[in-house]
Amino acid sequence: LPSGMTSVSLWLFFLGLLHMNLYFRLFWLLFWRTRHCRKIDFLGTSRITYRALPSDCDINFHLTNSRYPAFMDLARTYMLAEMGLLKRFLKLKWMPIVNAAEFTYIRDIKPLKKFEIETKVVGWDEKYFYIEQRFISERGLHCIVHVRGVFVCKGKQVPLEVLVKEAGYTDPAPELPPEVVKWKAFLQLKKERNL
């Protein structure tokens, strides 16, 4: 062992490196993967594959719940790259902010197993955009998530009509899926009861 380093501190050092894997994934995504991605339209489905590393898993030997949002952040970033919007939005200093998310876990993802995340914009209203994300493997659907968010610039929300226009989308807004409509109503009820 290096001078002054005990076996415990060495173990903690390696644990720290393992937890850096999200940063490594982000750097790989930004500096390599986005340069070699396919192109999709604004309402297209983006797909990216990952593997559940041991550092992504918990004592139940499956992908820990706290990792799902981290993978989702990466997948949404990749979706913007596939749409051809990532560089443009960064140049405009438009930053995405999640307002709400709802998760339905169906089956677990075991250590070292590959899984794919499907990400797509399912619609928007006068204030928010809505995204659906699915975790899928050869075993089937593992988790489905709905995300509601906005883009902000200098502390102010980017109007949805400006965002959609910048994305080059000119068709009418798609109708929100029924489950998203009910979720939206539920969020409104929570807001009314708690503010």
Feature annotation, model-predicted:
Residues 2, 6, 12-36, 109-116, ...:
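HotDog/MaoC-like acyl-thioester-processing domains
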Residues 22-78, 183-195:
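Catalytic strand-loop segment that frames the active site of acyl-thioester-processing enzymes
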Residues 43-44, 95, 166-170:
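Short, flexible turn/loop "capping" segments at secondary-structure junctions
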Residues 62-104:
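A glycine-rich, hydrophobic loop/mini-helix early in the fold
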